[in-house]
């Protein structure tokens, strides 16, 4: 799979793009390409449009509720029973967006997910499971790390609750810090998968920086692209060894959490989610986790290949 960009769905041109007027999350360089792609696009466009209309209907009904939930119940939406049809409709809309697989559909799904977490701090629907991989697919690695760290902190016994969504607790956290926090009392297997992907992309970028001359276009992360001089001054060898240690710990943690995780991750045909209910450590848990995180891995195949080789050699 190609890394996501704002580009024509058909020819990948990035100039003078038009949006699909129905789903709003597919772009084309011309009306001709839009017409040419319609037979395929309508398979995904129509469900998105349908779920958007249903969401609009539920939002209109909820905004008319006498308890004024959008003003008075923010942060407690899932506990407020009348808001549940709206939250479920929003979740269905996000699911429909996931089938479109464009930059705009992922960005839209992320925006809706973050707003759902603002409305419902308890996250009774498990929206937080998918957010880091959405950040990663958009090239927003720092925000992915801040999100993972915030929820890892929240899940600790002394994590606390300041009334703000956990993903807002940290900003520009150090991606080179120890990973133990993210492994203790962890809440979702796929967050650990997403953190592993982030660390491997980071490692590959650091290794690329060692090459002379290096190709700026080969860098996978903005974390490295925006800090080249700083990272070189810090000493690349030490950073590389540190990140390798983090990767080793994460791989060990993932295997201990679920022994099926590598079988599913390295065999895409086996990663289809079969159920929303599963027991910890089961094959179904691994399938659900990989189903959520795999698009981000598929758009970073160098990282997937590196992890597979690392796991097989260790």
Can you say where each PLM-predicted feature lies in the sequence?
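Long C-terminal extensions of eukaryotic subunits of large macromolecular complexes
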Residues: 1-7, 12-17, 32, 221-314
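Acidic/polar, low-complexity linker and loop regions
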Residues: 1-6, 82-116
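Internal amphipathic alpha-helical repeat/solenoid segments
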Residues: 2-14, 53-81
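Cys/His-coordinated zinc-finger cores
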Residues: 20-45
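Helix-turn-helix repeat elements of alpha-solenoid scaffolds
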Residues: 47-71, 99-111, 139
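Acidic, polar low-complexity intrinsically disordered regions
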Residues: 64-68, 84-86, 103, 119-120, ...
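Alpha-helical repeat scaffolds
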Residues: 67-75, 104-115, 141-152, 210-258
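Amphipathic alpha-helical repeat scaffolds of TPR domains
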Residues: 79-99, 121-137, 161-212
């Amino acid at each position: 799979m190609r890394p996501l960009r704002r580009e024509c769905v058909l020819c990948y041109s990035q100039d003078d793009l038009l949006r699909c007027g129905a789903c709003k999350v597919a772009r084309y360089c011309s009306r001709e390409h839009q017409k040419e792609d319609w037979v395929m696009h309508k398979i995904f466009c129509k469900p998105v449009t349908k779920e958007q209309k249903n969401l609009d209907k539920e939002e209109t009904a909820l905004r008319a509720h006498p308890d004024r939930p959008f003003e008075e119940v923010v942060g407690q939406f899932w506990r407020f029973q009348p808001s549940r049809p709206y939250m479920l409709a929003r979740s269905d809309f996000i699911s429909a967006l996931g089938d479109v697989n464009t930059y705009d559909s992922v960005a839209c799904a992320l925006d809706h997910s973050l707003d759902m977490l603002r409305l419902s701090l308890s996250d009774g629907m498990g929206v937080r499971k998918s957010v880091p991989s959405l950040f990663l697919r958009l090239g927003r690695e720092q925000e992915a790390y801040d999100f993972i760290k915030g929820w890892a902190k929240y899940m600790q016994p002394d994590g606390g609750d300041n009334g703000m969504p956990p993903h807002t607790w940290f900003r520009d956290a150090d991606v080179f810090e120890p990973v133990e926090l993210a492994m203790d009392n962890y809440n979702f297997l796929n967050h650990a998968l997403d953190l592993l992907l982030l660390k491997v992309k980071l490692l590959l970028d650091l290794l690329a920086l060692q090459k002379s001359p290096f190709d700026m276009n080969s860098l996978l992360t903005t974390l490295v692209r925006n800090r080249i001089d700083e990272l070189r001054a810090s000493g690349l060898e030490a950073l590389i060894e540190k990140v390798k240690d983090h990767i080793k710990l994460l791989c060990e943690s993932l295997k201990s959490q679920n022994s099926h995780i590598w079988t599913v991750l390295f065999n895409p045909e086996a990663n289809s989610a079969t159920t929303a209910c599963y027991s910890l450590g089961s094959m179904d848990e691994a399938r659900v986790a990989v189903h959520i995180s795999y698009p981000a891995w598929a758009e970073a195949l160098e990282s997937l290949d590196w992890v597979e080789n690392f796991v097989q050699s260790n």
